[in-house]
From Swiss-Prot:
It comes from Novosphingobium aromaticivorans (strain ATCC 700278 / DSM 12444 / CCUG 56034 / CIP 105152 / NBRC 16084 / F199). Its main location: membrane. It is a peripheral membrane protein. This is ATP synthase epsilon chain. It is found in: Cell inner membrane. The lineage of its organism: Bacteria, Pseudomonadati, Pseudomonadota, Alphaproteobacteria, Sphingomonadales.
């Protein structure tokens, strides 16, 4: 089972891929998203998004600044104000 993850800035699509899990730095604390997660929206604070490509894999960290995260039946979309790298 996999989660569709998209990371977008106002300027471009940074990532669009199938992953195992993503941990997002929400303003109310970090939250993890797996496939089938209940729909919700959250604001994102400056920090690292951790992308786990498979169960048990070491995470890849992507530094982001601000934005919003939306979990829907389609997966997780993060609209970040800025992505480093």
């Amino acid at each position: 089972m996999s989660l569709h993850f998209e990371l977008v800035t106002p300027a471009r699509l940074v990532r669009s891929e199938e992953v195992h899990m993503v941990v997002v730095p929400g303003t109310d604390g970090e939250f993890g998203v797996l496939e089938g997660h209940a729909p919700f929206m959250s604001t994102v604070k400056d920090g690292a998004i951790k992308v786990y490509r498979s169960a048990g894999a070491a995470p890849e960290e992507i530094q982001v600044q601000g934005g919003f995260a939306e979990v829907s039946a389609k997966g997780l979309t993060v609209l970040a104000e800025h992505v480093e790298g």
